[in-house]
């Protein structure tokens, strides 16, 4: 699977450099998520004759929210990405109806300049046409190490748990700006 991530460009040099610092931790995490029966992860691998052509995974990131991540496919195998997404759709369609699935929301982070996820997820949101059923929000992201981030904050900045009042303010602000589902999914 690691070779597949490199072959598809899912793990690109800058991402690998960032991950390499914690290589042993990443390896243990992947062994646990892919090798053990866990209630917080699911993965789908499309392969033929032992060769991986497509992959997608889900991780339960919040109490009743699952995140689709690590979607990748080899371009030489036509429609491998669609095959994996179709299977993931079938899985979530069946699975979310079970109370034990803890699946009220599905989220996915993707860069809008990536054509495939933008067409799949963006088109779904457009076709649904209701922010209270399916929403897309633009966020920024960056790589950082938690220890570096926390240790280098200067006054008056601090990183603390949000208060009830702050969460209410976030909800009100988000509702005005987006009207989507993100805060509910948290």
Set out the residue ranges of the language-model regions.
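Acyl-donor binding region in acyl/amide transferases
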Residues: 40, 48-54, 59-135
């Amino acid at each position: 699977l690691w070779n597949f991530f490199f072959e598809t460009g899912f793990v690109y040099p800058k991402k690998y450099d960032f991950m390499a610092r914690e290589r042993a931790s990443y390896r243990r995490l992947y062994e646990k998520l892919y090798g053990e029966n866990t209630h917080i992860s699911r993965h789908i691998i499309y392969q033929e004759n032992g060769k991986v052509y497509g992959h997608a995974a889900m991780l339960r990131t919040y109490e009743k929210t699952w995140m689709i991540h690590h979607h990748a496919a080899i371009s030489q195998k036509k429609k491998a990405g669609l095959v994996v997404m179709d299977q993931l759709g079938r899985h979530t369609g069946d699975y979310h109806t079970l109370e034990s699935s803890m699946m009220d929301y599905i989220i996915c982070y993707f860069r809008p300049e990536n054509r495939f996820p933008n067409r799949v997820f963006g088109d779904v949101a457009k076709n649904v046409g209701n922010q209270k059923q399916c929403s897309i929000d633009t966020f920024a992201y960056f790589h950082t190490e938690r220890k570096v981030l926390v240790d280098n904050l200067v006054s008056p900045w601090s990183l603390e748990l949000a208060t009830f009042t702050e969460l209410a303010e976030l909800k009100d602000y988000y509702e005005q700006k987006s009207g989507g589902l993100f805060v509910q999914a948290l």
